[in-house]
Structure formats: structure tokens, C-alpha cells
């Protein structure tokens, strides 16, 4: 699965830990380049992980994998992300013929919820 994450996602260090029907769990070791000037994980990195976790969950929501693109996303930053690792858990809320609603949550290495997001994705075929 990790070889299918694409070059950007591999570049930033994302790894798929578990993928099931309509679910995805990603992990990423926090590196210095993921941090903002305050020393916490940059919001763009958080948004990337929300998008990828929700997107992979949407890809595997049905009997066969389907290609998706993100139509819209909404992130809620609840607490600064610090520590050594980010855990992302994505799940499908509803998958239709053309669109999918997914939700993803980010946790720090202490298991604290730090960020949550909703994604609307469009199926390409």
C-alpha cells in the first residue's frame, strides 16, 4: 500500500498502517521540516494528513477501489500537534455514486485528538 501513496505523500513521510473498507490509518514521524516557527506541526501538514486519510478511506469504500479527488475540506485545529508522531484515522461517513463524505482525525503520540476534518470527495469514474 505504501508504494501507492504517491511521491508527495512519501516525500513528507506518510505511511499507511491499516486500510480497510472505508477506513484508513496513517502514521508519520514528525520531522523538523514539518514544524512551523513555533515548533508545532504546521497546519499544512495537518491538512495533508486529513486529506490523505479521508481520501484513502473513500478509495476503498466499495467493493472495488475507485479514483477520487477532493472537492472541499474543512479542518478544525483543536490543539497544537507536538511529539514524535502523528496518527491519522480516516473513515467514510457516506459514499454515493459520484461523491463521498469522509471524516479524518489527527492524534498526537499521547493519543490526544489535535485536529479533525470533513472532506467531500468526487469519484472520477
Briefly describe each language-model feature range.
Residues 1-125:
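Terminal targeting signals and extreme-terminal segments of soluble enzymes
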Amino acid at each position: 500500500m505504501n508504494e501507492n501513496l504517491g511521491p508527495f505523500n512519501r516525500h513528507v513521510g506518510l505511511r499507511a498502517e491499516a486500510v480497510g473498507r472505508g477506513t484508513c490509518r496513517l502514521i508519520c514521524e514528525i520531522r523538523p521540516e514539518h514544524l512551523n516557527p513555533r515548533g508545532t506541526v504546521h497546519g499544512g501538514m495537518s491538512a495533508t494528513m486529513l486529506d490523505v486519510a479521508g481520501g484513502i478511506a473513500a478509495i476503498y469504500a466499495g467493493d472495488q477501489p475507485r479514483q477520487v479527488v477532493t472537492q472541499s475540506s474543512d479542518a478544525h485545529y483543536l490543539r497544537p500537534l507536538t511529539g514524535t508522531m502523528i496518527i491519522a484515522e480516516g473513515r467514510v461517513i457516506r459514499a454515493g455514486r459520484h461523491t463521498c463524505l469522509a471524516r479524518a482525525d489527527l492524534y498526537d503520540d499521547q493519543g490526544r485528538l489535535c485536529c479533525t476534518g470533513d472532506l467531500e470527495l468526487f469519484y472520477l469514474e
